[in-house]
């Protein structure tokens, strides 16, 4: 499996970039920012040059990471494959936990999902290996919990 960094140091570096971007945006807009503004505009690719006209501008964003889950991740990965890129450009992980249906008990439900969704899991596992994504197998508990263990960002 590809190692995807998810550490406090990594988060701290991302927060520095986000604060720098927001300082530029605040200077340009001269208005208070909403939480949505902070999340989106903090991820601008080039905040100095980005057109910022509400309802009109298309934003060029640079996400910190991409997280796919097994249900919608299939179409997302197929779209990525159409780009003809050899590897993902940002840390990307695929989490196979949404196709497991609660019917009887954990072990039986996991076995049923492994059988019913084998083709999906095999495709996502193969695509993750080919394109440099992290892959969380079905049954890896609440595989997305790690996202919230990082020090929270405080946008002033």
Predicted feature residues:
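Short, contiguous pre-domain boundary segments
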Residues: 2-7, 22
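Long, structured ligand/cofactor-binding scaffold of large enzymes
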Residues: 11-13, 18, 22-156
């Amino acid at each position: 499996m590809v190692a995807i960094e998810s550490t406090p140091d990594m988060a701290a570096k991302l927060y520095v970039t986000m604060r720098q971007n927001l300082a530029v945006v605040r200077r340009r807009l001269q208005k208070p920012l909403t939480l949505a503004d902070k999340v989106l505009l903090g991820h601008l690719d080039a905040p100095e040059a980005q057109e910022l006209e509400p309802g009109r501008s298309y934003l060029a964003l640079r996400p910190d990471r991409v997280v796919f889950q097994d249900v919608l991740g299939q179409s997302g990965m197929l779209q990525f494959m159409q780009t003809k890129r050899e590897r993902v450009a940002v840390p990307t992980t695929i989490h196979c936990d949404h196709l497991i249906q609660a019917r009887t008990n954990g072990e039986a439900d996991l076995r049923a999902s492994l059988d019913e969704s084998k083709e999906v899991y095999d495709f996502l596992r193969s695509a993750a290996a080919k394109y440099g994504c992290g892959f969380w197998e079905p049954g890896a508990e609440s595989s997305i919990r790690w996202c919230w263990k990082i020090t929270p960002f405080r946008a002033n």
